[in-house]
Curated annotation (Swiss-Prot):
UniProt family annotation: Belongs to the peptidase S1 family.
Disulfide bonds: C128-C150, C177-C199, C239-C250, C244-C260, C262-C271, C280-C329, C315-C342, C414-C442, C489-C505, C630-C649, C661-C697
Induction behaviour: Strongly down-regulated in muscle cell lines derived from biopsies of 5 Duchenne muscular dystrophy (DMD) patients compared to a normal muscle cell line.
A Pfam family annotated for this UniProt entry: Sushi
Sites carrying sugar chains: N614
Organism expressing this protein natively: Homo sapiens
Stated name of the protein: Inactive serine protease PAMR1
PROSITE patterns: CUB, EGF_1, EGF_2, EGF_3, SUSHI, TRYPSIN_DOM
UniProt domain EGF-like: residue ranges: 235-272
Glycoprotein as UniProt keyword: yes
Limits of the CUB domain: 128-236
Subcellular location(s) of the protein: Secreted
Residue intervals of the Sushi domain: 278-344, 387-444
Length: 720
């Protein structure tokens, strides 16, 4: 395939040569063709096509004409290989060519650009670099394409050196500067000694040659491009940079090098040493940081520190100091400790006590791009493995506690199997000093009981079942005394601080007046009806607030629902877990066809009964009864009732075993089906026992429940 492309390209060039050698009297064979040149390229060409592009400089539409011929499918195929819009990539101003509906030979003659970007030249603006001999000048490269290579050689007069200063630098950053970079060497070719290699956008200090020539190389790889760079240069003598300290005099010799004549009391090649007393030279601030004198006598002449001077070091934003924060000038003229460095790092994100964090071993992360796929298809495995790839720089330097190196990965998981994670499971320290992904958190898994089916629910511990107790205020009756607690209802735990309960359980009968929170409490993990038989694992929690639904009707018991906010969080365990809230769309079958499990304690049980000690949490299966049939059923027994949209009626399911009398429990109703967070079956809260007229538990009359589905949004708003 590649050979065919090169053959076609070669033929195209041959055709172009033939065009230039045509005699003037050449007559067009096909008068419908755009011109003689097109006829030579495609003998039967009678049409042309236009390539539409955008000029990068001014963003106007440009283009050019190419000959084309109709194929068997009546499509116009190009008669020659053309480069598409890449010919305009480095243009600052483009020639409009044919993009206006007229015929031309724009592409054939190759007038691509009216003006190139600064630093680029040639018909396609892809050439760069030159030899510079002026005493001063500039090197400007405005933007750059992928895989660019440019070389400049600067020559100075004998006895002079060259000083190069970067005015602007915008290249891809890397600690090793191995992708996009400017490399400065002493001498006039690439074999000279490297003085400096720069990348990123931080301008280096002025660069000075050793001899009278300087070689500048720019290189870009095939992944990213930035704005380029701008540098100025000038010829100077070795003394131009004032290399002598302490007012020493710089003297040039015949070879162009220099010597320093020092004042009394100073010595050294650059007069840098003080003879009169010991002191410490300025340690300088770390790269990407700075220093401050925070103690002691300070500096001498701004360059040396007296004995006892304390210097503190600081880093710029998103950098962290590694090493000694302070250094002191000692009696021997040396600084204490080691010079610190500033490292790009990320502060560890805060997590809750429910989340466990683990630092993963440092490893190279790879990304597969379309270029990798191209290499995989075009080259052998051996050649592909030898192709250069980018690797992140290895971390260096120790960081203070609470910080992590660039590219460090943190893995998160919940500390307990009863919780599930929200947010990212893995986060990476980015170059910006921030972490990828979202902050993790752990919330309790709702509605999960292992290996439980609806027909086998008797004698089970339902971990979301909450026992609601009220404090007595009347005189004792033989079994209760003033101030004692007695069980009044069951509620459902929906998160660590929220219990959903029927509103009539926490209000005065027939009123909307709420019972004082001090006279109510919630017990979780309870199983036996007798409080004396409860295990030590139960949790007795105080209530901080009662939220009554605003539409609660204490007469009809419409909107019979309330929320209890717990003062302390419930401790999630095998015995205490929340139940899920369901939405209508979550039900796989219609609500009327659902088999619902009801659970609760017999709140009317006689404490003096022989079986009271062994009475436990009861459960059974009920079926939903049509609201109209429920009303007619009660009317047949002389009890007129109204079943609202916020209620549903249910009666005992004769095919399923049951040990519960729903009229005596004040319990909760739940259904098991797969949830949105997990395909595994989860139990969802569907209702709360509201009212019943079946005094004998004969199952002749249905029990009315508060339907939880219409109140889902209201519950979730108050769960936060």
């Amino acid at each position: 395939m590649e050979l065919g492309c090169w053959t076609q390209l070669g033929l195209t060039f041959l055709q172009l040569l033939l065009i230039s050698s045509l005699p003037r009297e050449y007559t067009v064979i096909n008068e419908a063709c755009p011109g003689a040149e097109w006829n030579i390229m495609c003998r039967e060409c009678c049409e042309y096509d236009q390539i539409e592009c955008v000029c990068p400089g001014k963003r106007e539409v440009v283009g050019y004409t190419i000959p084309c011929c109709r194929n068997e499918e009546n499509e116009c195929d190009s008669c020659l290989i053309h480069p598409g819009c890449t010919i305009f990539e480095n243009c600052k101003s483009c020639r409009n060519g044919s993009w206006g509906g007229t015929l031309d030979d724009f592409y054939v003659k190759g007038f691509y650009c009216a003006e190139c970007r600064a630093g680029w030249y040639g018909g396609d603006c892809m050439r760069c670099g030159q030899v510079l001999r002026a005493p001063k000048g500039q090197i400007l490269l405005e933007s750059y394409p992928l895989n660019a290579h440019c070389e400049w050689t600067i020559h100075a007069k004998p006895g002079f050196v060259i000083q190069l200063r970067f005015v602007m630098l915008s290249l891809e950053f890397d600690y090793m500067c191995q992708y996009d970079y400017v490399e400065v060497r002493d001498g006039d070719n690439r074999d000279g000694q490297i003085i400096k290699r720069v990348c990123g956008n931080e301008r280096p200090a002025p660069i000075q040659s050793i001899g009278s020539s300087l070689h500048v190389l720019f290189h870009s790889d095939g992944s990213k491009n930035f704005d380029g760079f701008h540098a100025i240069y000038e010829e100077i003598t070795a003394c131009s940079s004032s290399p002598c300290f302490h007012d020493g005099t710089c003297v040039l010799d015949k070879a162009g090098s220099y010597k320093c004549a020092c004042l009394a009391g100073y010595t050294g090649q650059r007069c840098e040493n003080l003879l009169e007393e010991r002191n410490c030279s300025d340690p300088g601030g770390p790269v990407n940081g700075y220093q401050k004198i925070t103690g002691g006598p300070g500096l001498i002449n701004g360059r040396h520190a007296k004995i006892g001077t304390v210097v503190s070091f600081f880093c710029n934003n998103s950098y962290v100091l590694s090493g000694n924060e302070k250094r002191t000038c000692q009696q021997n003229g040396e600084w204490s400790g080691k010079q610190p460095i500033c490292i790009k790092a990320c502060r560890e994100p805060k997590i809750s006590d429910l989340v466990r964090r683990r630092v993963l071993p440092m490893q190279v992360q790879s990304r597969e791009t379309p270029l990798h796929q191209l290499y995989s298809a075009a080259f052998s495995k051996q050649k592909l493995q030898s192709a250069p790839t980018k690797k992140p720089a290895l971390p260096f330097g120790d960081l203070p506690m609470g910080y992590q190196h660039l590219h460090t990965q943190l893995q998160y998981e919940c500390i307990s199997p009863f919780y599930r994670r929200l947010g990212s499971s893995r986060r990476t320290c980015l170059r910006t000093g921030k972490w990828s992904g979202r902050a993790p958190s752990c919330i309790p898994i709702c509605g999960k009981i292992e290996n439980i089916t609806a027909p086998k629910t008797q004698g089970l511990r339902w971990p979301w079942q909450a026992a609601i107790y009220r404090r007595t205020s009347g005189v004792h009756d033989g079994s209760l005394h003033k101030g004692a607690w007695f069980l009044v209802c069951s509620g459902a735990l929906v998160n660590e601080r929220t219990v959903v309960v029927a509103a009539h359980c926490v209000t005065d009968l027939g009123k909307v007046t709420m019972i004082k929170t001090a006279d109510l409490k919630v017990v979780l993990g309870k199983f036996y009806r007798d409080d004396d038989r409860d295990e030590k694992t139960i949790q007795s929690l105080q209530i901080s607030a009662i939220i009554l639904h605003p539409n609660y009707d204490p007469i009809l018991l419409d909107a019979d629902i309330a929320i209890l906010k717990l003062l302390d969080k419930a401790r999630i365990s095998t015995r205490v877990q929340p139940i899920c809230l369901a939405a209508s769309r979550d039900l796989s079958t219609s609500f009327q066809e659902s088999h619902i499990t009801v659970a609760g304690w017999n709140v009317l049980a006689d404490v003096r009964s022989p079986g009271f000690k062994n009475d436990t949490l009861r459960s059974g299966v009920v079926s939903v009864v049509d609201s109209l049939l429920c009303e007619e059923q009660h009317e047949d027994h002389g009890i007129p009732v109204s079943v609202t949209d916020n209620m549903f009626c249910a009666s005992w399911e004769p095919t399923a075993p049951s040990d519960i009398c729903t009229a005596e429990t004040g319990g909760i109703a739940a259904v098991s089906f797969p949830g949105r967070a997990s395909p595994e079956p989860r139990w969802h809260l569907m209702g709360l026992v509201s009212w019943s007229y079946d005094k004998t538990c004969s199952h002749r009359l249905s029990t009315a429940f508060t339907k939880v589905l219409p109140f889902k949004d209201w519950i979730e708003r108050n769960m936060k």
